[in-house]
Amino acid sequence: MLKTLMALAVLTTPVSAATPQPALQWSSCPVADAPELQCADLPVALSPKSDRKITLKVARLPATGAKKGSVLVNFGGPQGYQIASLGSRTKIFDRIRTSMDVVTWDPRGYPGLSGAALQCDWGFVRTPAFPADQAGFDRLAAANKARGDKCRTTDPELFDHMDAASDARDADAVREALGEDKMNFLGLSYGGTIAQSYARLFPQRVRTMYVDGTGNHSPRDWGRELGSIARDNERLMGRFLAWAPAGTEKRWRALIAKADREPIPAPKAEARYDGTQLRSLAFLKLRPGPTRWGDLVAAITAAEAGDASAFALSSRQPYPGLPGGGVKECLDFPRPATQRDVARTVKRLRAIAPNLGAAFPLAWHLPLTCAGWPTRATNPPAPMPRTLPPLLGAGTWQDYASTRRVVEQIPGSRMIEHDGPGHNLFGAMANPCVIDHVSRYVTERRLPPRGTTCP
């Protein structure tokens, strides 16, 4: 009888949860020109298997009406200063705030208001040239490892837990501290990678999820996704070529072929560009749209005459590259193990997209700056559960297709298309039409009709 009662007790007693998050103690934020913003400190676990705690700074814009919930936002980056971003973008949340608090946090490891920041070089990292042989690849991997080790020595345990999945766990700790059973999540740009990671780890906690101008971190086949991105970029190049004078495509192909044989000088930038670098710099000049495309035509003309200086984005940083050092990205995306891996990818993508090829960050910059990284990729791309509630996404010429590949995985989801250039419609562009649809979706769980467009 005693054994029976004990067994029943085990079956009927709730499994004890992890230690509850403490209630947040809100006070003023150390952010200029954001008097409505309130901040609080939140201790979170460094990792699921660690007893160590780190402190996150959390911020909110309080609801202006009767509060019915909270919405968590990450503006992208993927670096810090999310709280400053919220403080400078309060107006886009006016409708959401009629019934919800808007909450963000400065992410772990980065400069900002949260504790436990890594002491790293967060500046510009030049994209390496594709290595010609295995010896060149090995030298590149060794240099990357040395750069990563220099950062890692400041806090090895934190460095090893900087992936978007760790951010997603931090987001769920914020949800719990807010006392919310389910969360509304806005993931903008790289914030969409964090949102997808959250959806994989905590699908039962998602009430609504909006992704804007994000990459697809949820494919079943990463190689196939790289091919899709190459096609997306080639379509953008196609818009430019249709706009440009007749014969521009033929001239462009001849120019990059010439640069692949012998780099073209850019004396005003004190640089020389090979074909891949020209492809990458041209892609960056495509993104602003037709108002700046004349500059690209002029750059092509000057380079044909032997001076590629007009391709430089600035004299200080004339070569392609990205800021941030890869501390998060190297843990979130696959990396090559050999020079042969790199060569195969380049050959395949150039066949898919002859005008731009592999000259985009996820095929060039990240693989070549993450090869040899001292921490393995702990949060590689993987599909999201199809049991999630319908998502909402939005995108421009540059990123509509990749965002669509995220949301179309979940039945009933919707997309908003902006037929124009730009990036991050809700946050950076503050598109009124998009803001209206997102606000309605988050507060009422009402999705726009299929085929919705915003000017």
Please place each PLM-identified region on the residue numbering.
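Hydrolases whose catalytic domains are alpha/beta-hydrolase-1, hotdog thioesterase
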Residues: 194-198, 402
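Active-site loop->helix "elbow" adjoining a glycine-rich segment at hydrolase catalytic centers
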Residues: 189-194, 202
